[in-house]
Amino acid sequence: MAYGIVHVFPGGTKEQYDASVAAVHPSDGSLPPGQIFHAAGPSTGGWTILAVHDSQESWESFRDGVLLPQMQQGIDGGFTTPPEETTVDLYTLQQ
């Protein structure tokens, strides 16, 4: 089942987003394994990222193996605080 993640970074900026994505996504511009959708943009009071993975397991693998270690290590110019997170077991996904 597809799995959706919404991250809201209060006070986040485009520059922080660009630095963070450069650190955790493949350098060729593709999506991480298992991620099938990614969108981001400015939102009220910060920056929001929407991602869809092909399963909760692929999200957890990316989160635990790539995202959290990079963020805990610190990303030069990246987001400085953890996001507000909402996750969704997606019933419907149309492309």
Spans of features found by a protein language model:
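Short S/T/G/P-rich N-terminal loop/turn motif that feeds into the first structured element of a domain
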Residues: 1-50, 54-69, 77-95
